[in-house]
Amino acid sequence: MKSGKVWGETELVLQTPFIEFHRIWVHQGGFCSLHKHEFKWNMFYVTSGELAVHTHKNDYDLIDTTVLGPRQWTTVKPGEYHSFEAVHDTMAFELYYPEPLSKISLERQWEDIFLNECNTSR
């Protein structure tokens, strides 16, 4: 379902406990206010138009602007203030996801159980 925004429209494509995936349409000159996501990464992938993503670094000391065209993307780290604005009418995908899982996010126990059962059945 599409929702109207001051800057255009957004449509929720997929939501799970781990990600939120939105399609956004931003009118030329449309922009979102400065904000941050405390624990989520924010990724923008542009399919048409041009989107400028402004990220505030070093407690506002530096504003990093990335202008994205079709098939280009960028990410914003958790806790970074950012905003976006459309240089031209833009369609993009916006993805939110939590801090990356640790590399050791899977613990297997079946191997030990299987080996123990094999050894005790002899």
Describe the residue ranges of each PLM region.
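A short glycine-rich, His/Asp/Glu-containing loop-to-beta-strand
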Residues: 1-36, 40
